[in-house]
Amino acid sequence: MVLVTTRRALLRVLGLLSTASLAGCSAIDSDPKPGSLLVVNNDGVPHTLRLDISRDSETRRETVDIGAGEWGLRNELFTEPGTYEVTVRLAESDGATATTTVEVTETTGGGLTGENLEVYIDQEGSLRAVTRRYD
């Protein structure tokens, strides 16, 4: 399930996250965790994303709905250590595709460290998928 809100709320949360990171605090629930998915829809229409996630020769499909001009964060998309090959497509378009690799490792304490997946839908429905490291 993706939490959806407005751009104004996203800017407010990003400001809080910046303040929290400067203060050394990571207790904010909307803070992206390693293995999470952040979707930002900068387009003026809602979209459905199809994610094909492959690891160790097994593939699973996830579907994410995101409203026009909204964003959503889903922690725990990648819950096991490993290298994930991810292909993202707009369900309503055959052409818009983005592919990237997400690395997640296990910490000595049993938690996860590594990257999260960020997907940006730009105006007119073009896609970007990038990874960002969170420890």
Regions picked out by a protein language model, each given a short descriptive name:
Residues M1-R60, V64, G72, G82-E92:
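Hydrophobic alpha-helical segments
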Residues E62-I66, R74-E76, A98-T108:
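Generic detection of short hydrophobic beta-strand segments and adjacent strand-loop junctions
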Residues A91-G125:
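Structured interaction patches on ligand/partner-binding surfaces of diverse proteins
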Residues G82-T87, A96-T99, R133-D135:
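A general structural signal for short secondary-structure boundary/capping elements
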Residues F78-E80:
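Surface-exposed, short loops/turns at beta-strand junctions within beta-sandwich domains
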Residues C25-S36, N116-E118, Q123-D135:
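Extracellular ectodomain segments of secreted/surface proteins
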